[in-house]
């Protein structure tokens, strides 16, 4: 029996099959791991990878394409990558690193990728920003003109900082660099400033102590902590400062004032050096790669005071650099000094002599901050830096001279009292009116007959007296930010009256 084949049936069956076929064809840029180790992977086959593109490995680890070479791609891993092995497949995602941003981050501790690490649950944020974004241009900025009060008398008087400024805090280890940064954050309590503290390559216990201090002082209500501790991959330690800048940038473009602390950029440079050497990039001075200046300049240039048209927001950056035996002429310190608008130099000799904060006024400078200093502070602080510098010179000279004339002795005595005046305990920032009153007393001779060891108790008592007794002066300076005739008269009266009670009690 012959089977008759009807062409129309065949064509309808084929038609049906074609209509039912719905499998999508996806084109993916996939490569193969040639070599992996030390947080670095070499990948073959990713011909279309972009510089800085995120790559996804078989085990879910994310990497960043860094070296685009002729026959392979060098990528850095953002995780342990323990299950990645030779022959594993890698997919290019077509995306560049970005993090969630928004109000939900305030009060939280996150890692370098914006993921919460404080055990308080997920961060619900609908917005995200690229970790690397261009700095504001010339037209987008305006000059620094508003003060960023640190609450530390020595800094606010001699090395003032303005909103939108980049001021380097530099010194040897254990000289109080982080303490200055934390005090500055605590002092922003009433100022409507969003603070971002970036901990790079530090011990996890140190970061926990900082967070605890901020919580105790009520500062976590307006602070975000970004932490890439010493145990994390070098890639995350390198990315953490950019993450901090991105979070602050979100608020800056919303018209808010922000403060970012990078603690510290020496460790970021070391992490970048480690990555670069493992990627076989040619080393330069101190084995750092040739573009180590650029990693810091592109980060710190993102700090700015925005123009009125862009909402008047600002990002103030306080990068920290650790020196070895006070050597500020090393590679990374000189790089960052040249990028920033001034530096606060902390001396281990002053610190060990009990002068804390151990600010060395001779080589500390603020290039733009004086324009932002309040009128009241400008009036009293003008002479103090010069007097302290002269005191340091005279003190060195007095060690060799046996008989000094009265004028020199008086200058030495006043210098000692000014030195005492600027001492300040940790985590106790002062308001502007308190700083102005203390400095006014010092430079106008009110302390000349107070014994040096009693200066601290005199200033503490004076602050209490101004809070409770003579409120006219405090309110005047608070509202006008200037030391007018009325405020000065009230301050003189308060100083004279307080001095009588202090002497009577002594």
Swiss-Prot record:
Entries under CDD domains matching the protein: ATP-synt_F1_alpha_C (cd18113), ATP-synt_F1_alpha_N (cd18116), F1-ATPase_alpha_CD (cd01132)
What is one GO cellular-component annotation here? proton-transporting ATP synthase complex
Q: What does this protein do?
A: Produces ATP from ADP in the presence of a proton gradient across the membrane. The alpha chain is a regulatory subunit.
Under InterPro entries, the record lists: ATP_synth_asu-like_sf, ATP_synth_asu_C, ATP_synth_asu_C_sf, ATP_synth_F1_a_nt-bd_dom, ATP_synth_F1_asu, ATPase_a/bsu_AS, ATPase_F1/V1/A1_a/bsu_N, ATPase_F1/V1/A1_a/bsu_N_sf
Residues carrying the site annotation Required for activity:
364
MF terms from GO for this chain are: ADP binding; ATP binding; proton-transporting ATP synthase activity, rotational mechanism
Query: What SUPFAM superfamilies does this protein map onto?
Result: C-terminal domain of alpha and beta subunits of F1 ATP synthase (SSF47917), N-terminal domain of alpha and beta subunits of F1 ATP synthase (SSF50615), P-loop containing nucleoside triphosphate hydrolases (SSF52540)
Does this entry carry the keyword RNA-binding?
no
* Pfam entry (one): ATP-synt_ab_N
> Which PROSITE patterns does the entry link to?
ATPASE_ALPHA_BETA
Q: What is the originating organism of this protein?
A: Nostoc punctiforme (strain ATCC 29133 / PCC 73102)
Q: Which reaction does it catalyse?
A: ATP + H2O + 4 H(+)(in) = ADP + phosphate + 5 H(+)(out)
Can you state the subunit structure given in the record? F-type ATPases have 2 components, CF(1) - the catalytic core - and CF(0) - the membrane proton channel. CF(1) has five subunits: alpha(3), beta(3), gamma(1), delta(1), epsilon(1). CF(0) has four main subunits: a, b, b' and c.
Record's protein name: ATP synthase subunit alpha
